[in-house]
Regions:
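Residues in well-ordered beta-strands of folded domains
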Residues: 40-42, 100-102, 154-156
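Serine/threonine-rich low-complexity intrinsically disordered regions
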Residues: 23-24, 44, 112, 120, ...
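Compact mixed alphabeta submodule
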Residues: 116-188
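A broad, structure-centric signal for solvent-exposed, well-ordered loop/edge residues
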Residues: 50, 106-108, 157-163
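Structured, beta-strand-rich domain cores
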Residues: 64-145
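OB-fold ssDNA-binding interfaces and closely related basic DNA-contact patches used
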Residues: 1-98
Length: 188
């Protein structure tokens, strides 16, 4: 029987997701263009639990922004962190909501189901399934909106690689060859 990983509100603006899919991971080294550790999370539109918890945390961050950054009101040009994957042309995004989560201060800790650290970058790839701890925050620099900080990741399961990931050599050459019936002594 498969386990169900429930999303949870940890504080008003911090959550633990349910099972989500990883895309564009830059988790072991900072992404050169942004100078941050980051990834995109794909949340199945049927996962009402994760989406509900996430929306509560986003609303709390909006209220925080209204009170602390946006002069008592939510701006008309507010940018939210969730985007509709059906509007994207990226592989695997259909039927999902997606968001970008970043951390410029520290590398997220990445663990497996036994809560042991994952140190091999190839174990955590675009297409695998994870759950993540995230923190939402309001911002008013370069526009107004709610951003998402990536805290930590737990890998839950392997999945089909996204983005045309290459196959392994072992998979490409999984046959043992056939005996051609000839003598293998090439020096005769």
């Amino acid at each position: 029987m498969a386990k169900i990983y429930k999303a949870k509100l940890i504080t008003d603006t911090k959550i633990k997701t349910g099972k989500v899919r990883l895309s564009y991971p830059h988790l072991f080294e900072k992404y050169e263009k942004s100078g941050k550790y980051q990834c995109v999370l794909l949340i199945d539109k049927k996962d009402k639990d994760t989406l509900g918890v996430m929306k509560k945390a986003i609303e709390a961050a909006k209220e925080q922004g209204k009170n602390e950054k946006w002069n008592g009101k939510i701006p008309g040009n507010y940018a939210g962190p969730l985007h509709d994957g059906d509007d994207s042309d990226k592989e695997g995004y259909e039927g999902c909501w997606y968001l970008s989560a970043k951390n410029g201060q520290r590398r997220p800790q990445i663990i497996d189901l036994d809560k042991d650290d994952i140190l091999d970058e190839e174990e955590v790839y675009a297409g695998c399934y994870i759950r993540a701890s995230l923190r939402f925050f309001p911002y008013n620099q370069s526009g107004n909106g709610v951003g998402c900080v990536l805290e930590n990741i737990q890998k839950l399961a392997d999945g089909d690689p996204l983005g045309g990931g290459s196959s392994s050599a072992a998979d490409d050459f999984d046959d043992d060859g056939e005996d051609d019936g000839e003598d293998d002594d090439l020096m005769d």
